[in-house]
């Protein structure tokens, strides 16, 4: 009995560490992408290349669980929405202030409530209405510009972060709708989606040229790809063993890591409006956790 309880506590402790590790990595992942872009590899191409590394490794790791997998419209929709989310997350971080982009991305619970109502026919509860109100108020506080007279994002990176959060919510709702897929298959769909969409964007919107990056940058591309696969597995492990309410609180530590990293590595700081708006958006995420629980 004692041994079973001990193993249970140990397993939960490992799961908590796994989620903290995931939040830490996602709070720092923008920095190597900025280094890669500074070396001459665009954000879109860097995303496609790093996710291609994750995809190749994933096909090796998951090969036994992917045999006989069936692909349908739901899986394609998950792949495309996840691709837009992940690509937008990286591009937003590259072209905007880290914390403003990340907080706009964290409006995802707002979109989740609305999309779940539209796609899954879930009722809008009082908690859901509170989430919508907190999210919108936080965004209004953070984005309000007296000189413009409107609470709109003012930089391309902010618009991209907002769109990435919407696509993240859409992907989550689609995954809940198509719950018959395995975690491994959904992970591979995400990786394939980012590679295809990223390369498509590069082909259509960027000049065709071979990047003249050094060996150290190409090694960094490979390392980031390995980390992307590893963190996907680590976070999935934690989410399967920790209640949703506690998991979201742990994952919100990404904001703390990102704020410290942006200040230390990029010299970016937040003003009073950003702190107040961010607090409301975080509160909305905590309400979202209560709804999920």
Report residues per predicted region.
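Juxtamembrane helix-loop boundary signature in multi-pass membrane transporters
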Residues: 1-21, 113-166, 279-293
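Membrane-interface helix-cap regions at the ends of transmembrane helices
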Residues: 2-6, 54-71, 137-152, 194-217, ...
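Loop-to-transmembrane-helix transition segments
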Residues: 14-22, 65-88, 132, 155-164, ...
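Transmembrane alpha-helical segments that form core, pore/gating elements
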Residues: 19, 23, 27-35, 58, ...
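Specific transmembrane alpha-helical segments of multi-pass solute transporters/efflux pumps
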Residues: 28, 65-100, 105, 141, ...
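C-terminal transmembrane-helix exit sites in multi-pass transporters
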Residues: 62-64, 108-130, 256-275
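Helix-helix packing/entry segments at the starts of transmembrane helices
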Residues: 102-107, 175-193, 229-264
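C-terminal-most transmembrane helix of multi-pass membrane proteins
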Residues: 144-145, 248, 252-293
């Amino acid at each position: 009995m004692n041994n079973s309880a001990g193993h249970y506590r140990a397993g939960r402790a490992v799961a908590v560490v796994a989620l903290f590790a995931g939040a830490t990595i996602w709070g720092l992942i923008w920095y190597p992408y900025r280094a890669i872009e500074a070396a001459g590899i665009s954000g879109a191409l860097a995303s496609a290349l790093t996710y291609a590394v994750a995809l190749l490794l994933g096909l090796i790791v998951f090969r036994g669980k992917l045999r006989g997998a069936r692909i349908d419209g739901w899986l394609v929709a998950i792949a495309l929405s996840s691709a837009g989310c992940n690509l937008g997350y990286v591009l937003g971080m590259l072209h905007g202030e880290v914390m403003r982009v990340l907080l706009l991305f964290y409006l995802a619970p707002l979109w989740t409530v609305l999309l779940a109502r539209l796609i899954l026919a879930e009722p809008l509860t009082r908690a859901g209405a509170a989430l919508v109100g907190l999210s919108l108020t936080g965004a209004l506080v953070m984005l309000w510009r007296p000189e413009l007279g409107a609470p709109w994002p003012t930089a391309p990176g902010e618009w991209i972060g907002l769109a990435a959060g919407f696509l993240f919510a859409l992907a989550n709702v689609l995954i809940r709708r198509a719950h018959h897929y395995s975690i491994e298959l959904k992970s591979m769909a995400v990786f394939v989606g980012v590679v295809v969409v990223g390369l498509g964007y590069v082909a259509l919107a960027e000049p065709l040229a071979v990047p003249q990056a050094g060996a150290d940058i190409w090694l960094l591309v490979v390392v980031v790809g390995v980390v992307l696969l590893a963190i996907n597995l680590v976070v999935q492990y934690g989410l399967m063993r920790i209640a949703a309410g506690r998991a979201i609180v742990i994952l919100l530590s990404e904001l703390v890591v990102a704020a410290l990293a942006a200040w230390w590595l990029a010299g970016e700081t937040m003003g009073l409006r950003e702190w107040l708006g961010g607090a409301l958006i975080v509160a909305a995420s905590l309400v979202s956790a209560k709804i999920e629980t």
